Design a protein with these regions (language model features):
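Surface-exposed patches in mature extracellular/periplasmic domains of secreted proteins
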Residues: 135-144, 215-227, 295-297, 321, ...
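Extracellular-facing binding/remodeling surfaces
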Residues: 285-298, 316-319, 351-364, 380
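Active-site acidic/histidine clusters and adjacent loop/turn architecture
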Residues: 98-137
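Second-shell loop/turn segments in exported
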Residues: 110-119, 190-199, 267-274, 294-297, ...
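Basic/polar, cationic surfaces and motifs that engage anionic cell-wall
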Residues: 2-8, 18, 26, 33-97, ...
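Short, solvent-exposed linear patches
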Residues: 367-371
């Protein structure tokens, strides 16, 4: 959710606001009835605390607890808000009378603690809530669910668990602008830019995702990283790279089988200061094409390039400007290029084609073709966005 050095940060590090362009906006209405007056009681068939009965990929059980089964799928033990000592929200969360269509995976960008206790997990959940409410001004925790490095799973925003168990409605979150109703947000404690999640966290993540998919009818292919939709490092390079594996393992828990091709999604590369190579050079040509960069592209993502990205983001009304070239800015920057044109956008195509030794390029280079040239092709990442009226707080 945040970035290194900002334990619980969201806004100020991520690019907020609605995604520019002609993205699909899904219909849906806010739940019109009064919300519950108290944290709803767990269902009679709900899970009970205890060690997990579901072995992880390494054969070891995770600590989140998953004894009961629902339609053959393990039910994780998820601590409700009152169990980890949550504050009362500033005002009741909104509940939408619709199901989410995907899951977004985040990391907290906090410390990779070695304290795997339930007490440490609860302290972390409270710290996130305090930051979101006191620094960001949100009504409650932004994410729907939180998983600690010890594998303990907790409800994030109030009523998220009750609505998940019901399987028909969703609590409006604040974990990613444009994805706060149509996507369930899961925070994973730690920073995963250079290390992998703990086995306990990983096991709880896959079990929790499988249960969410079951209750809401979400396909296991519809698991994404925060960076797929925003200009952010989240959920870290290592955790993001593990998403194809996560999709396959979640599918397995649901009794399905996904091939490596089916579990791979087309993405936009995340470019940042210090990167080098043809992708950076192509991006520089596109930035010059857009009027945001002057001078000769040299394939180095330096301060000049970061400033150009920031200028482009400002021009496209990003709420936050951070100089990271990721899933929000690429679709705006990589415009359609047609054969026969001789401009900087066409030169960007030539740079990538030469780097990948592509002998022929289609007459029209659109987003899927750009992603092939960038080497990140796969099944498309859908651009569906939240319905109108989402508060993003």
């Amino acid at each position: 959710m945040g970035e290194p050095g900002q334990s619980w940060s969201r806004r100020g590090l991520l690019v907020g606001g609605a995604v520019a362009g002609a993205g699909l906006v899904l219909p849906g209405r806010a739940f019109a009835g009064p919300p519950p007056t108290a944290d709803p009681a767990p269902p009679a068939t709900g899970p009970v605390p205890g060690p997990s009965a579901v072995p992880g990929p390494d054969g070891m059980p995770g600590p989140a607890g998953a004894g009961p089964l629902a339609e053959g799928v393990p039910v994780p033990y998820i601590a409700r808000c009152f169990e980890w000592g949550a504050r009362k929200p500033k005002f009741p969360p909104r509940i939408w009378d619709r199901r989410p269509i995907r899951i977004l995976v985040h990391h907290t960008a906090g410390a990779n603690t070695n304290d795997y206790s339930v007490g440490a997990a609860h302290r972390m959940a409270r710290a996130i809530q305090n930051y979101h409410m006191d620094r960001n001004g949100w009504l409650d925790s932004g994410q729907h669910f939180t998983i600690s490095r010890g594998g303990h799973v907790m409800e994030g925003r109030l009523w998220s668990l009750g609505e998940l168990n019901g399987g028909r409605r969703v609590v409006e979150g604040a974990h990613s602008p444009g994805q706060n109703v149509i996507a369930i947000g899961i925070e994973n404690e730690g920073t995963y830019t250079g290390v992998d999640p703990t086995p306990a966290l990983w096991n709880s993540l896959r079990v929790t995702c499988a249960y969410i998919c079951l209750r809401y009818g979400i396909a296991p292919t519809e698991l994404y990283g925060h960076r797929d939709y925003r200009n952010t490092l989240c959920p870290g390079d290592r955790l993001y790279a593990a998403l194809p594996r996560l999709r396959r393992e979640v599918a397995g828990l649901l009794g399905r089988r996904l091939s490596r091709t089916e579990s791979t999604k087309a993405s936009w590369p995340l470019l940042r200061t210090g990167d080098r190579g043809p992708m950076v050079e192509a991006a520089q040509y596109l930035l010059r094409d857009a009027g945001s960069l002057t001078g000769k592209p040299d394939g180095r993502f330096d301060d000049r390039t970061a400033a150009a990205v920031s200028e482009f983001q400002r021009a496209h009304r990003a709420d936050d400007v951070n100089g990271l070239l990721g899933g929000e800015t690429w679709p705006e920057l990589a415009r359609t290029v047609r054969a026969g044109t001789e401009d900087d956008a066409a030169r960007a195509v030539e740079v990538l084609a030469a780097a990948r030794r592509v002998e022929s390029v289609p007459d029209v280079v659109d987003h899927p073709q750009w992603q092939k040239l960038l080497g990140t092709s796969g099944s498309a990442v859908p651009d569906a966005q939240d319905p109108q009226g989402v508060l993003n707080r």
